[in-house]
Amino acid sequence: MAALKLLSSGLRLCASARNSRGALHKGCACYFSVSTRHHTKFYTDPVEAVKDIPNGATLLVGGFGLCGIPENLIGALLKTGVKDLTAVSNNAGVDNFGLGLLLRSKQIKRMISSYVGENAEFERQFLSGELEVELTPQGTLAERIRAGGAGVPAFYTSTGYGTLVQEGGSPIKYNKDGSVAIASKPREVREFRGQHFILEEAITGDFALVKAWKADRAGNVIFRKSARNFNLPMCKAAGTTVVEVEEIVDIGSFAPEDIHIPKIYVHRLIKGEKYEKRIERLSLRKEGEGKAKSGKPGEDVRERIIKRAALEFEDGMYANLGIGIPLLASNFISPNMTVHLQSENGVLGLGPYPLKDEADADLINAGKETVTVLPGASFFSSDESFAMIRGGHVNLTMLGAMQVSKYGDLANWMIPGKMVKGMGGAMDLVSSSKTKVVVTMEHSAKGNAHKIMEKCTLPLTGKQCVNRIITEKGVFDVDKKNGLTLIELWEGLTVDDIRKSTGCDFAVSPNLMPMQQIST
């Protein structure tokens, strides 16, 4: 109240000092602060910045793969020895770097993540019952964090409807004998405009450990390229946010409109002592080679699928491509066609792999591969990325599958008790009815087991979400009510051949044609 009175009196003084023409006299005084004191506290020792994190704390840890991870702060936690942590992070780095170091030292009790990925120790601890893992769709994870920072306690999303995320029962912790000790709980379901949505609760942390590029001495922060990812929403969602940066600059060095995170969200700040900035998957192209090759010599089956998948692209479309065959299909996009490739880690306008001297640890795709961007590209955070995806702004999603059902159910993220990679962003990518979903895969699994079947036997990624299936044997269109229709058939095969290798019935288009291949 005293401050308001002071401001009020200052404004009255300013007003009374005006002459009849509205000009200010020299004696005018407006009591606005010009102090350089800021609430962000600066540290030189990362251990000092995190030493009060208690056992059992919930930590939000930024990064995507190894891109944009707070290396120095993670190293400091190894030194403090804090334990029984709940770590909220898209994934857990690799076995010997990033959060993988805290897993190895058994300091983490529970991970809330979207992707286990290639971290063998992460998967081993989970399947052996040593670690609790709450697997959450990547876009839902980003939005839960964003909501937590915005004071929104919960929200509805179509992502995960009809899957274990909605139904409950997904393993969070295993017993030593492989049985489920803790399972996820069902989500509340509501219907809006004829579509089903599930209720997801916001996530907040006791502390957030964030990696940024630069900060000014006021505590304002900017990120670099695709290293923004989960770092940005996590800044806003913790009781105490600790940010490590590569450089600290003077106040005024940033134009106000260029600041990514205002100082109000930054409580502690430290300049990292050193950075390894390890690259998880160094992918390069050679000089004069504009595009990567489509596959290894002799991979005729994959080549066939890739060259058919490339025909799904249309000029001007926005597309998100999964790793493997979908991404390789982009190598065959015509130079006369523009397709804007979106990557869920926060890039729009992906280009080819870099030359050796262009590789940048801060610029990767969703497969953690080094990439470049094309003119007109943009970078953004993970929550922004999935707003594009969930909102139906991406025209095409192309991804692989373990199983697809007759009516378009998709399974591609888990084999219970055996393989847990996590759903990553796949559940979000297939959640919008405005986005065409194309599955590319080999027609049969090992031992000629069916992959196209009456009903999926593996946990679903999405329910009735697939629009088209492309295999080396043919192309199916999928109708949510009427099922499959064979529209293209590989030369030399018969419809009976397809029936024998397909685990459900299907219709045959009256306009059945030979399987198309893009010309090269």
From Swiss-Prot:
Pathway: Ketone metabolism; succinyl-CoA degradation; acetoacetyl-CoA from succinyl-CoA: step 1/1. The modification N6-succinyllysine is found at residues 185, 418, 421, 455. GO terms for cellular component: mitochondrion. It catalyses: a 3-oxo acid + succinyl-CoA = a 3-oxoacyl-CoA + succinate; acetoacetate + succinyl-CoA = acetoacetyl-CoA + succinate. Transmembrane segments: none annotated. Belongs to the 3-oxoacid CoA-transferase family. Key enzyme for ketone body catabolism. Catalyzes the first, rate-limiting step of ketone body utilization in extrahepatic tissues, by transferring coenzyme A (CoA) from a donor thiolester species (succinyl-CoA) to an acceptor carboxylate (acetoacetate), and produces acetoacetyl-CoA. Acetoacetyl-CoA is further metabolized by acetoacetyl-CoA thiolase into two acetyl-CoA molecules which enter the citric acid cycle for energy production. Homodimer. Only one subunit is competent to transfer the CoA moiety to the acceptor carboxylate (3-oxo acid). This is Succinyl-CoA:3-ketoacid coenzyme A transferase 1, mitochondrial. It comes from Rattus norvegicus (Rat).
